[in-house]
Amino acid sequence: MAKVSKRMKEISAKINAEKKYPVSEAFDLLREVSSVKFVESVDVSVALGVDPRKSDQVVRGASVLPNGTGKTVRVAVFAKGPAADAAKEAGAEVVGMEDLADEVKKGNMDFDVVIASPDSMRVVGQLGQILGPKGLMPNPKVGTVTMDVAKAVRDAKAGQVRYRVDKAGIIHTTIGKVNFTSDALKQNLERLLTDLKKAKPAVSKGIYLKKVSVSSTMGPGINVDFSDLNI
């Protein structure tokens, strides 16, 4: 317990919870306070000026980060015929229809993303209670139900992140790893915030991007001054 307390004291001495740090300085701080034996992810939280209790203010979507996330993504695709062939060529690990659905029902789900062609939804629709709770259910709003399954596979492999505003009006996602360069993390953050601005509900009034903070997997949140970003 004393060890944890000592670490937290060291972190508190380096990070001012009330300050908004320039982006590059924030990423440098993440590395300074990282003391675990694995390469941590860099997570971001964005507080939005929306009321998620209202259906027309629910912000959800996907963003393809220019420098990826640093994670290896395994993709499963529900498709048949030429679409199935295209998905395999694009790099999908698992492609199928009823046979893939049977594997899902058995609990064999060694994949991180599920993509479906529109004509496969009659099969995928039966798997909602299994895929839904795991955040794997395909949805056209985030591009995982699509005619162009090959592009969706490539996007997933390239570092696409999906997001949905929570009950507090906050988006949580990842933008890379602590061993990324600060420039790479900055570019990823800029792409995410740009896409979030594009997803702003028409009925949202006042300040939309209210607060941005970054953190490593095991680290504290660091408030970011995003006013000088190219968004």
From Swiss-Prot:
InterPro entries tied to this protein: Ribosom_uL1_bac-type (IPR005878), Ribosomal_uL1 (IPR002143), Ribosomal_uL1-like (IPR023674), Ribosomal_uL1/biogenesis (IPR028364), Ribosomal_uL1_3-a/b-sand (IPR016095), Ribosomal_uL1_CS (IPR023673)
Can the keyword Repressor be found in this entry's annotation?
Answer: yes
Looking up NCBIfam families in the UniProt record yields: rplA_bact (TIGR01169)
Give me the disulphide-bonded residues. none
Q: Which family is it part of?
A: Belongs to the universal ribosomal protein uL1 family.
Which lineage ranks, top first, belong to the organism behind this chain? Answer: Bacteria, Pseudomonadati, Pseudomonadota, Gammaproteobacteria, Thiotrichales
What's a Pfam family in this record?
Ribosomal_L1
Can the keyword rRNA processing be found in this entry's annotation?
Answer: no
- Put simply, this protein is called Large ribosomal subunit protein uL1
Q: How does it assemble?
A: Part of the 50S ribosomal subunit.
Task: Describe its function.
Answer: Binds directly to 23S rRNA. The L1 stalk is quite mobile in the ribosome, and is involved in E site tRNA release. Protein L1 is also a translational repressor protein, it controls the translation of the L11 operon by binding to its mRNA.
Where does this protein come from, organism-wise?
Answer: Francisella tularensis subsp. tularensis (strain WY96-3418)
The biological processes this protein is annotated with in GO are: regulation of translation; translation
Which gene produces this protein? Answer: rplA
Q: Which UniProt keywords apply?
A: Repressor, Ribonucleoprotein, Ribosomal protein, RNA-binding, rRNA-binding, Translation regulation, tRNA-binding
Give the Gene Ontology MF terms in alphabetical order.
Answer: rRNA binding; structural constituent of ribosome; tRNA binding
Q: Which GO terms describe its cellular component?
A: cytosolic large ribosomal subunit
What HAMAP family does the record point to? Ribosomal_uL1_B
